[in-house]
Design a protein with these regions (language model features):
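Hydrophobic alpha-helical topogenic segments used for membrane insertion/localization
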Residues: 2-27
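A short loop-to-beta-strand scaffold at the N-terminal edge of the catalytic core in hydrolase folds
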Residues: 47-58
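Conserved HGGG/HGGXW glycine-rich cap/lid loop of the alpha/beta-hydrolase fold
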Residues: 57-102
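Conserved catalytic-core motifs of eukaryotic protein kinase domains, centered on the activation segment
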Residues: 76-78, 103-109, 168-171
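Active-site loop/oxyanion-hole signature of alpha/beta-hydrolase fold enzymes
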Residues: 94-134
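Conserved hydrolase catalytic core segment
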Residues: 128-172
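Conserved alpha/beta-hydrolase catalytic His-Asp/Glu region
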Residues: 169, 194-229
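A catalytic-pocket lid/entrance helix-loop region that shapes and gates access to the active site
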Residues: 169-188
Length: 229
């Protein structure tokens, strides 16, 4: 009888804990997007096989594709300070990569080749002619691979702060595979993700990695990255 009572108590506590974490996750989700900073009047959607891809199109002239860094908090909003200037001489396409920003975030394993396929397909089906590309951070690696795969799709390529080859040469280790499995867990994994991508961690990212002078960052930029994550 005592054993049965312990099982019932454990079951009730587990259920209550799960419900509490679930509602906490919902609260964090709602709080992150309440300012709606990623809304865009120029919204367009490219329906790809793995999900809908959000992009904007501005200006006239030779085509130019802007690709943001590959971070969970990244989005096409990274280019907001220069895309209007570029649009004076180019037709500027700004993407939110699959799994980022306003694009779909399917529960799949994201690989370099997945993004190679996305970029090549987008240029062929949406832009339709050789395109100049500006890529930030990790995105530069799969742009180079995409160019090697389909060279006729590309004009000039510019990479901003490309990731060094030593980092690109790494493969997933036991720790990263374990973390991936943890994040993929329902409810608990979502809470872990929210912890890793909390606003304080986004602020730290801006301070230590994104700005030479951290005082130049704006609260709105931090909020936009937090919303994207």
């Amino acid at each position: 009888m005592k054993h049965s009572k312990k099982l019932v108590t454990l079951s009730v506590l587990t259920t209550m804990s799960g419900a509490a974490i679930y509602f906490l996750n919902k609260t964090l989700d709602t709080a992150a997007v309440r300012k709606n900073l990623l809304a865009s009047a120029e919204k367009e959607i490219f329906s790809w096989q793995f999900g809908d891809i959000f992009y904007t199109k501005k200006g006239t002239g030779t085509p130019m594709l802007l690709l943001h860094d590959l971070h969970c908090a990244s989005s096409g909003r990274e280019w907001q300070y220069i895309e209007d200037t570029l649009a004076k001489d180019h037709t500027v396409y700004t993407l939110d990569l699959l799994g980022c920003g306003r694009s779909d975030k399917p529960a799949i394993t994201y690989t370099n080749f997945l993004y190679v396929q996305l970029i090549v397909t987008f240029i062929k089906q949406v832009i339709g002619c050789p395109t100049d590309v500006i890529a930030s951070g990790l995105s530069g690696s799969f742009v180079v691979t995409a160019c090697n795969t389909a060279p006729k799709c590309f004009g000039r390529i510019m990479m901003i702060n490309p990731t060094d080859l030593a980092k690109l040469n790494k493969i997933p280790d036991k720790r990263s595979r374990f973390l991936k499995r943890m994040i993929e867990l329902p409810i608990v994994g979502t809470l872990l993700y929210h912890t890793l991508t909390g606003r304080s961690n986004i602020e730290l990212l801006f301070t230590e990695s994104y700005y030479h002078n951290p005082f130049h960052r704006s609260p709105e930029d931090v909020d936009a990255f937090y919303e994207s994550a």
